[in-house]
UniProtKB/Swiss-Prot annotation:
Organism name: Xenopus tropicalis (Western clawed frog)
Disulfide cross-links: none
Region (Disordered): 77-96
UniProt protein name: Large ribosomal subunit protein uL4
Biased composition (Basic residues): 79-96
Keyword tags: Cytoplasm, Ribonucleoprotein, Ribosomal protein
């Protein structure tokens, strides 16, 4: 069991060897402390100066609906359904 202070979080201690799959128990007060430390998307950080939590790159996560939309389908080229088989390159020294 490892106890870590929320205000002094170290990613190398939290995720040993770069593996983020450790079992972590977070309390409600630790989430409040993280909100004060890093802020949320609606309010800026109280404890860090000039730090804003970055916004998501993708606001709509329904990727299949986006990819099947008419705007995207018009921009894509038609699929190439013709299968081109590779010719067998014969070795003249072995195949006499």
């Amino acid at each position: 069991i490892t106890l870590l202070n929320v205000s002094k979080l170290n990613l190398l201690r939290l995720a040993l060897g770069g593996h983020v799959g450790r079992f972590c128990i977070w309390t409600e007060s630790s989430f409040r402390k993280l909100d004060d430390l890093y802020g949320t998307w609606r309010k800026s950080a109280k404890l860090k100066a000039d730090y804003n939590l970055p916004m998501h790159k993708m606001t709509n996560t329904d990727l299949t609906r986006i990819l099947k939309s008419q705007e995207i389908q018009r921009a894509l080229r038609a699929p190439n359904k013709k299968v081109k088989r590779r010719e067998l390159k014969k070795n003249p020294l072995k195949n006499l």
